Regions:
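Short helix/loop capping segments that flank catalytic or ligand/cofactor-binding pockets
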Residues: 42-44, 74-76, 102-103, 123-125, ...
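Active-site nucleotide/adenylate-binding loops and adjacent lid/helix of ATP-dependent enzymes
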Residues: 1-99, 113
Length: 246
């Protein structure tokens, strides 16, 4: 239904999640301005209208979701570079069979299928240049990693197509061994995603969720749901998935 797909709007996603008591990234409620410390003549000035401010756009709110920058919790930080790593999230794909039958979806229609941890690089703004470490969805064991940075670059017709394999066992910036580490609360994280899928978008067949572990207690926070998603090279329950889409 259209209501399910409203959550593609990142602001509506946050509001609906809060209404459903789902832990998401906190936001600020006021507009902000940013000034360059040296530029003059108004050249270094930017004004951002907050989506939370209903005074903009006839009550719809502004274009920008304004949030305080979050940091990785101790568990993930122990595997990341010390110098300015980005928030390094788990990408978890969940599925729903709720659209295959008439009436309301049931909780057991929802299943989390795969998990990949995006180990961010030193001084990167986001985890889009990360090493994608496959995480076993049942045991939480972090397996080998691969790349997908070439997905975000135009590829001229005369340029050789980039292929990558699961060959990374260590973080390239620190040489720290990642493969073999255990995400001990993997089931808790997968359940967290399944609950979000059920409460927010029970009839959407597939969604990719970005989950962060933040603060001293490695608090689970949902950043967003991605409706145009893929498995990011992660292990998934193939037979269950194939039967669902058949």
């Amino acid at each position: 239904t259209k209501e399910n797909y409203d959550c593609e709007d990142k602001w509506k996603f946050l509001i609906k999640s809060k209404e459903k008591d789902i832990a998401v990234t906190p936001w600020l409620n006021y507009d902000i301005i940013c000034k360059d410390r040296n530029e003059e003549g108004g050249l270094g000035f930017m004004s951002f209208k907050n989506a939370a401010n209903s005074q903009h756009n006839n009550g719809i709110g502004g274009q920008w979701i304004i949030q305080e920058k979050l940091s990785n919790g101790p568990f993930l930080s122990s595997m990341l570079p010390k110098r300015n790593p980005p928030l390094s999230t788990f990408r978890i794909i969940s599925s729903s069979k709720g659209g295959l039958h008439v009436g309301q979806a049931k909780r057991n229609d929802i299943r989390a299928l795969s998990c990949v941890w995006r180990a961010g690089r030193e001084n990167a703004a986001t985890d889009h240049t990360a090493i994608l470490f496959n995480v076993h969805p049942k045991t939480g064991e972090i397996l080998k990693g691969t790349l997908n940075t070439h997905w975000y670059h135009a590829n001229p017709a005369n340029k050789k197509i980039t292929l990558s394999t699961h060959s990374y066992t260590h973080h390239p910036d620190t040489n720290k061994l990642i493969t073999g580490m255990i995400v001990e609360n993997i089931q808790e994280i997968m359940d967290f995603v399944e609950d979000a899928h059920y409460k927010l978008i029970p009839h959407v067949p597939l969604c990719g969720w970005d989950v962060a572990l933040c603060g001293e207690k490695n608090e689970k926070l949902l950043l967003e749901g991605n409706f145009s998603c893929n498995f990011f090279r992660g292990t998934f329950e193939e037979m269950y998935y194939f039967e669902m889409v058949e």
